[in-house]
C-alpha cells in the first residue's frame, strides 16, 4: 500500500507502521487540494494539524477496526432513534476553528448546526467542531498525541469526548471542566450532552473473535 499524490509519486505504507507525519511546507495544500488528496487515498485516514502538518495513518488491524466500528455502530443506532443529531464515522473530516482537519472514530453533531451549512460545506470537510467525539486508541497510536488531540477538540468547542484505551480498559472523559479517567467501565453514558445514549463496552474490551 502507498500514499498516492497527483504527480504519481507514492510512499509505501505497511499496516503495522505508525502514522506518517509530513511537516507543513512539504505539501502545500489548499482546502480543495487536501480534500482531493484524501479522496485519492480513501483506504487511509488522513488528518491535518493546526500547524499544517499532514498526518497519514495506516489502516486499522482487525481488533482496532472492530472496536472503533462497534463504538460508531452503537452511536449511529442511538442517533437515528433519537433524531436530534447525526452520527459520523472516521471517513468524515471536520475542519476545526483552529485550522486543523480531524476525522474522529465516531462523532455526533446537533442537527440544527448542520442545517445551517451550505450544500457545498456539507459535501466537503464539515467546517465545525463536533459536539461529541469518540477516539479509540489502536496499538500503533501515540497515546500522548491522542491526549493532545482530545484537548484540541475541547478548545475548539467540543462538549464531550471519550478516549477509549482498550490496552488498559480505561476511558478518559474530556469536557471543559477537565479530564476524568474511568477504569474498566462496563457502560458509559453521554448525559447531559447526549441524553439517553449509553455505550456498552464489553465487546470493545473483549472482541468476540
Predicted regions: what they are:
Residues 1-209:
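Gly/Pro/Ser/Thr-rich low-complexity, intrinsically disordered segments predominantly at protein N-termini
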Amino acid at each position: 500500500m502507498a500514499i498516492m499524490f497527483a504527480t504519481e509519486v507514492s510512499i509505501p505504507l505497511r499496516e503495522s507502521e505508525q502514522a506518517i507525519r509530513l511537516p507543513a511546507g512539504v505539501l502545500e495544500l489548499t482546502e480543495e487540494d487536501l480534500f482531493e488528496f484524501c479522496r485519492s487515498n480513501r483506504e487511509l485516514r488522513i488528518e491535518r494539524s493546526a500547524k499544517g502538518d499532514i498526518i497519514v495513518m495506516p489502516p486499522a488491524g482487525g481488533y482496532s477496526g472492530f472496536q472503533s466500528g462497534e463504538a460508531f455502530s452503537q452511536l449511529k443506532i442511538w442517533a437515528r432513534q433519537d433524531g436530534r443529531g447525526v452520527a459520523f464515522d472516521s471517513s468524515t473530516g471536520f475542519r476545526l476553528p483552529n485550522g486543523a482537519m480531524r476525522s474522529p472514530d465516531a462523532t455526533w453533531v446537533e442537527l440544527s448546526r448542520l442545517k445551517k451549512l451550505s450544500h457545498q460545506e456539507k459535501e466537503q470537510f464539515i467546517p465545525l467542531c463536533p459536539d461529541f467525539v469518540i477516539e479509540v486508541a489502536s496499538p500503533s497510536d501515540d497515546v500522548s498525541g491522542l491526549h493532545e488531540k482530545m484537548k484540541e477538540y475541547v478548545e475548539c468547542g467540543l462538549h464531550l469526548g471519550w478516549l477509549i484505551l482498550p490496552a488498559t480498559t480505561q476511558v478518559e472523559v474530556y469536557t471543559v471542566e477537565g479530564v476524568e479517567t474511568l477504569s474498566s467501565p462496563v457502560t458509559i453514558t453521554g448525559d447531559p450532552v447526549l441524553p439517553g445514549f449509553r455505550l456498552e463496552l464489553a465487546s470493545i474490551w473483549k472482541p468476540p473473535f
